[in-house]
Amino acid sequence: MPQERDPFPFPRYENDFTLTGRKEIQKLSDDKPTHLAQNDEPWRRLHNTTTEASSRRTVFHYDTTTPKDSLDIHLKAAYDHHLGLFQNKSQTVMQMETVGADNGTKKNKELEDSVCDAENKGIKVWVDTQKASLYSIKGSIESHHTASTNRGYSRKHDGGFYST
């Protein structure tokens, strides 16, 4: 076979290069390199303005209320042994700042409260006055496999067992 022959039949499929020709590489709008352009506005202002989280990560940050050792963590915890008995370790050292003390996020808290109040309008909460027994099958989802008999199978209406 001659080497000039195209092995792919017609119609030839078009792609990005054959349809519109070669595309130009997009040029940067600035002639400055990136490391020099970052010294101008708005880059400089964004870099120099600290947030609460970024200021805590700096070397010079010192918070007088932070616990210094394990004893301080346990003493400042929001855990009350009389109210929360048999909680796991992570719940016993939960700090007030994490639980919900005001730590400077006032705007987020106001938004949260307004959303919750708007969502809960018209919802009635019902609490059962009598605690139901764990072993009662009353009100359970009906199925032919329940633990209401010795073998774990329910009985048919005629007294026999269901089988699969």
UniProtKB/Swiss-Prot annotation:
Biased composition, class Basic and acidic residues, residue ranges: 155-164
Listed Pfam families: DUF3695
Keywords: Cell projection, Cytoplasm, Cytoskeleton
GO cellular component: axonemal microtubule; cytoplasm; cytoskeleton
Region (Disordered): 145-164
Compartments (UniProt record): Cytoplasm, Cytoskeleton, Cilium axoneme; Cytoplasm; Cytoplasm, Cytoskeleton
Biological role: Microtubule inner protein (MIP) part of the dynein-decorated doublet microtubules (DMTs) in cilia axoneme, which is required for motile cilia beating. May play an important role for the maintenance of myelin-axon integrity. May affect intracellular Ca(2+) homeostasis.
Protein name: Protein CFAP276
Naturally occurring in which organism (per UniProt): Danio rerio (Zebrafish)
Lineage: Eukaryota, Metazoa, Chordata, Craniata, Vertebrata
